[in-house]
From Swiss-Prot:
Gene Ontology CC annotations of this record: cytosolic large ribosomal subunit
Presence of the UniProt keyword Ribosomal protein in the record: yes
UniProt entry keywords in alphabetical sequence: Ribonucleoprotein, Ribosomal protein
Protein family per UniProt: Belongs to the universal ribosomal protein uL29 family.
Pfam entry (one): Ribosomal_L29
Family annotation (InterPro entries): Ribosomal_protein_uL29, Ribosomal_uL29, Ribosomal_uL29_CS, Ribosomal_uL29_sf
GO terms classed as biological process: translation
A molecular-function term among this protein's GO annotations: structural constituent of ribosome
Family matches, as NCBIfam families: L29
Name of the molecule in the record: Large ribosomal subunit protein uL29
Recorded superkingdom: Bacteria
Transmembrane region(s): none
């Protein structure tokens, strides 16, 4: 999800998506540990998506407009 798409969401929607992505990340790490992970780059994608969403929420709290 692109940053501009994230900025169009409400804070509550972003927090819901972050929670879902954290669950997915947990499952991906579990699959990695058991050797069942087919696409290891998905872990990086999910981590970066979480970071983007948290950045947008933090920008809103501080009051930075982009």
């Amino acid at each position: 999800m692109k940053t501009n798409d994230i900025r169009e969401l409400t804070t509550a929607e972003i927090e819901t998506k972050v929670k879902a992505l954290k669950e997915e990340l947990f499952n991906l790490r579990f699959q990695l540990a058991t050797g069942q992970l087919e696409n290891p780059t998905r872990i990086r994608e999910v981590r970066k998506a979480i970071a983007r969403m948290k950045t947008v929420v933090c920008e809103r709290e501080i009051g930075i407009n982009r």
